[in-house]
């Protein structure tokens, strides 16, 4: 929670940082990792601050410390979350008419898979073939439900299915990736470079959702992207619904990715 992250930074990270007199970010981060286990979100917050300070000191954009940006803009999708088919269609059509978004994601998994799939397909049919519609199942389906649900989504023209099964069941994720043409994306299964390597080693997804906080930092998110690149896995820039600071830190990171085939969902500040 934000409260626990704040408490950990105040009680454990701050004393280390106050003792550290170095302006070497890498050395400071090494000391933090040696002293503190886990705490990915807190480590990301501290790393973001350290890199931002260093970038300001050097007078360069933060992305320059991550290798330099390869793009000046990022595509951003919009999430449709009312749960009401007609309302979601109307909201999407409004966004399309305003030329704000042409890619949409729906969070599903609360209802029986048949009901969720019917809802998604109705929206896709209303928006047409030129609009990309994706779903985030949020780990809700069993492997059997995944087989039936993803087949229906694929037949209905859905472009991507995010984390359809349990985090721990990477074998099921691999089997689904092998079985379907629609892109299967790993999200919560990725908690940094090591988990990315485990999933990539068995080609357990077509796409990786990279999130700086979930990865443990901007540098670790870059490492996840490198693992994906070496394994031939596409990338998607994810969000934990950060505010402006986390969003711009993510944007600086994602702008350095050579491959960002599925865009981003950095819409937090737009809410």
Model-found features: residue ranges?
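Metal- or metallocofactor-binding catalytic centers and their adjacent structured scaffolds
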Residues: 1-57
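Predominant activation on well-ordered alpha-helical scaffold segments within soluble catalytic domains
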Residues: 6, 10-14, 47, 51-52, ...
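Conserved, mostly hydrophobic/aromatic
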Residues: 13, 46, 59, 104, ...
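Flexible, glycine/charged-enriched surface loops at secondary-structure junctions
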Residues: 23-25, 62-65, 160-167, 238-240
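Glycine- and other small-residue-rich loops at beta-strand/loop junctions that grip anionic moieties
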Residues: 43, 81, 108-112, 135-139, ...
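Glycine-rich, aromatic-flanked loop segments that form ligand/cofactor-binding clefts
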Residues: 48-80
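Metal-dependent enolase-superfamily TIM-barrel catalytic cores that perform enediolate-based chemistry
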Residues: 67-180
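Shared catalytic-loop signature of beta/alpha-barrel
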Residues: 157, 168-185, 190-271
């Amino acid at each position: 929670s934000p409260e626990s992250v704040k408490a950990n930074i105040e009680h454990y990270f701050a004393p280390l940082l106050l003792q550290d007199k170095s302006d070497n970010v890498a050395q400071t981060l090494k000391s933090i990792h040696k002293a503190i286990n886990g705490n990915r979100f807190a480590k990301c917050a501290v790393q973001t601050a350290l890199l931002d300070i260093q970038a300001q000191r050097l007078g360069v954009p933060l992305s320059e410390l991550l290798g330099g940006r390869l793009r000046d803009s990022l595509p951003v999708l919009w999430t449709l979350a009312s749960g009401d088919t007609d309302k979601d269609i109307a909201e999407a059509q409004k966004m399309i008419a305003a030329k704000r978004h042409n890619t949409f994601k729906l969070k599903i998994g609360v209802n029986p898979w048949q009901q969720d799939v019917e809802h998604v397909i109705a929206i896709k049919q209303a928006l047409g073939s030129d609009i990309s519609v994706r779903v985030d199942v949020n780990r809700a389906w069993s492997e059997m439900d995944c087989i039936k649900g993803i087949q229906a989504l694929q037949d209905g023209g859905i472009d991507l299915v995010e984390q359809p099964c349990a985090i721990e069941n990477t074998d099921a994720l691999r089997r689904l990736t092998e079985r379907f043409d629609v892109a299967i994306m790993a999200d919560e299964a990725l908690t940094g470079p090591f988990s990315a390597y485990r999933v990539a080693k068995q080609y357990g997804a077509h796409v990786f959702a990279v999130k700086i906080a979930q990865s443990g930092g901007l540098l670790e998110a870059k490492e996840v992207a490198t693992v994906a690149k070496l394994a031939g896995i596409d990338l998607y820039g994810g969000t934990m619904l950060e505010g402006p600071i986390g969003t711009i830190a993510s944007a600086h990171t994602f702008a350095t990715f050579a491959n960002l085939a599925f865009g981003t969902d950095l819409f937090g500040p737009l809410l």
